[in-house]
A protein has these predicted regions:
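N-terminal helicase ATP-binding lobe
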Residues: 1-352
């Protein structure tokens, strides 16, 4: 109906400020009354640069930033401002000797986190590898648990603040997460005053995160998620949509002879396809790209030319880029991965 007034009123009352902001940007008619103008002014008070939190996010952030406990847990849905909170916390505790470490579970998350932190804290020395440490008095380390553990074990340094991303991994019993538990213990051994902040979307009870040296954990939880995903299932050439309220699948009209045809029929301007293993991913990507025509585009030609020049002529992804398809996995060199990721985000012709 294009009538956003009910959604606008609901969002104002429940503090869903990003929704209010979006509606006001696209419907100036809602700024006709004095009350609506006042709402706009009040909401803008919560904005920091380009980031606008919900009221629940804002309140949780303030609680975390003012909490003096040495162990804090922030439980919130994925993509709900965790990186923003980490940056705000670092800015608050920042000093000339600050040593902080952000621990990410995989190498693939290193550069993503680095770009965000570097943009917000450009004046700080940032380490991405334990070998980058050269005796600095102050730094922000963005590391995997393996690299952080090597840094503490082999170098004369310690952390004042430790930010654990995907903290629920502590519950797993594999080697990587045993290393994470060792890292937390060693951080406290080397600096008893080390403050640890745990971030996760999945922790049921934060007391389960207790490791050596932890008495109580302050927990802050985001209960209301304004972003609800829609789930579709493709099976036996048919597609269904999942209703989370009735826990039931409803079959949709139409038939699709292959999964590739289903994807192509429902594609948007940008589409992220997740495959579980690098070897399998490359095979699936090649088969998928075979469904697409070659693109005639100066932008695509320029990307291909650059890859041939800086990687090699027979690089497998060249034939895929011609069709607007790229892939990313942890075994790609970082400089290639960063370039491909940037071009995929900024080139309209690359849809998959």
């Amino acid at each position: 109906t294009s009538d956003y007034k009910p959604l606008y009123d609901f969002s104002v009352n429940y503090g869903f400020f990003p929704i209010v902001d979006y509606i006001l940007e696209h419907d100036e008619n809602l700024l006709q009354s004095v009350a609506d103008v006042i709402n706009k002014v009040n909401i803008d008070k919560y904005r920091t640069e380009s980031f606008l939190p919900t009221i629940q996010q804002h309140n949780a952030y303030e609680c975390v930033l003012n909490d003096e406990n040495s162990d804090i847990s922030f439980v919130a849905p994925t993509s709900f401002g965790k990186s923003e909170l980490i940056v705000r916390h670092i800015k608050k505790v920042n000093n000339l000797t600050l040593k902080a470490a952000i621990i990410v579970p995989t190498k693939s998350l290193l550069m993503q986190t680095y770009k965000y932190v570097k943009a917000q804290l450009a004046d700080k020395k940032i380490l991405l590898h334990d070998q980058m440490y050269t005796g600095e008095e102050s730094y922000i380390a963005i590391l995997t648990q393996e690299r952080a553990l090597r840094l503490l074990e082999k170098r004369n340094t310690n952390f004042d603040y430790l930010y654990i991303d995907e903290a629920h991994n502590l519950f797993e019993k594999d080697m990587r997460n045993r290393l994470l538990a060792r890292l937390i213990r060693l951080s406290r051994v080397k600096n008893q005053k080390c403050e640890i902040l745990y971030f996760s979307p999945l922790v049921e009870t934060s007391d389960n995160l207790k490791v050596l040296g932890t008495s109580t954990i302050s927990e802050y939880r985001i209960e209301n998620n304004i972003k609800i995903p829609t789930y579709y299932l493709y099976q036996n050439k048919k597609a269904s949509i999942y209703n989370r309220y009735f826990n039931k699948l409803y079959e949709l009209p139409g038939q699709y002879p292959t999964p590739y045809r289903y994807i192509l029929s429902n594609a948007t301007d940008k589409n992220l396809l997740y495959i579980t293993a690098p070897k399998k991913m490359e095979v699936v990507t090649i088969k998928f790209a075979q469904q697409l025509p070659d693109l005639v585009s100066p932008a695509i030609d320029k990307i291909i030319s650059s890859i041939k020049r800086h990687v090699h002529n027979e690089f497998q992804m060249v034939s895929l880029i011609k069709k607007g398809v790229v892939y990313l996995h942890g075994k790609l060199p970082d400089y290639v991965k960063d370039y491909i990721e940037y071009k995929a985000a900024t080139t309209l012709e690359i849809k998959y």
